[in-house]
From Swiss-Prot:
<dbReference type="GO" id="GO:0005829">
    <property type="term" value="C:cytosol"/>
</dbReference>
<dbReference type="GO" id="GO:0005198">
    <property type="term" value="F:structural molecule activity"/>
</dbReference>
<dbReference type="GO" id="GO:0000502">
    <property type="term" value="C:proteasome complex"/>
</dbReference>
<dbReference type="GO" id="GO:0006511">
    <property type="term" value="P:ubiquitin-dependent protein catabolic process"/>
</dbReference>
<dbReference type="GO" id="GO:0034515">
    <property type="term" value="C:proteasome storage granule"/>
</dbReference>
<protein>
    <recommendedName>
        <fullName>26S proteasome regulatory subunit RPN9</fullName>
    </recommendedName>
</protein>
<keyword id="KW-0647">Proteasome</keyword>
<dbReference type="GO" id="GO:0008541">
    <property type="term" value="C:proteasome regulatory particle, lid subcomplex"/>
</dbReference>
<dbReference type="InterPro" id="IPR054179">
    <property type="entry name" value="PSD13_N"/>
</dbReference>
<dbReference type="InterPro" id="IPR035298">
    <property type="entry name" value="PSMD13"/>
</dbReference>
<dbReference type="GO" id="GO:0043161">
    <property type="term" value="P:proteasome-mediated ubiquitin-dependent protein catabolic process"/>
</dbReference>
<dbReference type="GO" id="GO:0005634">
    <property type="term" value="C:nucleus"/>
</dbReference>
<dbReference type="InterPro" id="IPR000717">
    <property type="entry name" value="PCI_dom"/>
</dbReference>
<comment type="function">
    <text>Acts as a regulatory subunit of the 26S proteasome which is involved in the ATP-dependent degradation of ubiquitinated proteins.</text>
</comment>
<dbReference type="InterPro" id="IPR036390">
    <property type="entry name" value="WH_DNA-bd_sf"/>
</dbReference>
<dbReference type="Pfam" id="PF01399">
    <property type="entry name" value="PCI"/>
</dbReference>
<dbReference type="GO" id="GO:0043248">
    <property type="term" value="P:proteasome assembly"/>
</dbReference>
Amino acid sequence: MFNNHEIDTILSTLRMEADPSLHPLFEQFEKFYEEKLWFQLSESLTKFFDDAKSTPLRLRLYDNFVSKFYDKINQLSVVKYLLASLKDSKDFDESLKYLDDLKAQFQELDSKKQRNNGSKDHGDGILLIDSEIARTYLLKNDLVKARDLLDDLEKTLDKKDSIPLRITNSFYSTNSQYFKFKNDFNSFYYTSLLYLSTLEPSTSITLAERQQLAYDLSISALLGDKIYNFGELLHHPIMETIVNDSNYDWLFQLLNALTVGDFDKFDSLIKVQISKIPILAQHESFLRQKICLMTLIETVFVKNIRMLSFEDISKATHLPKDNVEHLVMRAISLGLLKGSIDQVNELVTISWVQPRIISGDQITKMKDRLVEWNDQVEKLGKKMEARGQSIWV
């Protein structure tokens, strides 16, 4: 550990270059370091690294100050400070070196640790570093190394009973980035939702980052061939970033139209907007098949009957009657519904529909159906009572 005079010199030099609003933090650094108040020092460092005005000085503070007592403060906080320092770096090889060096330092500390000396190992810090190393490989476009590291990391995480949220969040975030690179819409969608579910309250995401993620999730929901339930996404607060933006609000409307099987609205949006996003334009035929499937499901839901004619399905989905059988078979193969097809009489009998998160309008329709069902049961009860009076007498 450096002596106090050297630390004072380092901090004084950095303080002179820092934004005036950060000067009180440097005074705290000096005071807490001298008094060995590591927890308080860590809290002050967190404030510094979370402040956007600290960006130009982050790496130098990490190199010249934090690295001198990394073994005294929370291991995940040390990794967080390093990641904040490297956030805007385009030198990915340098970033890998920093991450590898810190990992080696943690491993060295653990190798020297005496059994039962009360100190905690640095396994959590190493796991977080591995996840961020995989992310850096992705940024270098080395997808093979990234995938290998993520697969090894997943095996390790699966064996653990308890994992800090910061680690699982980093793992899901890096994994979702990998799936985005691979255009794996299904995996990206579900992994990104897991990422959002593990976000700590203290984690700050910029508006631009939230909007980009909402956009990417919307595209994946539309193009994923195994994604037919959008309720969780539509109700997530992150979607507010595109609902309130005139450039992207149509994506939200498009997903809503899919959810409720509104063929006409979906068709009108596609005709006007699809050319704005080339990847959607490339998959237009798939999108039209998807709205037909969702319209079929909604037709079953709304009509509240188990038997539908080919004619009913044809009208709802705007498909020729000859294509109805194929559509129903496709829905059954995807696990969206269960039933049987009577080709001779052109009837489809539905026995089960996949559970899904439904909208407020759909809940209202369900309530109306329950009220109607209750009325019918009540009428039947009164009729049976009237006809059975002579028997009871």
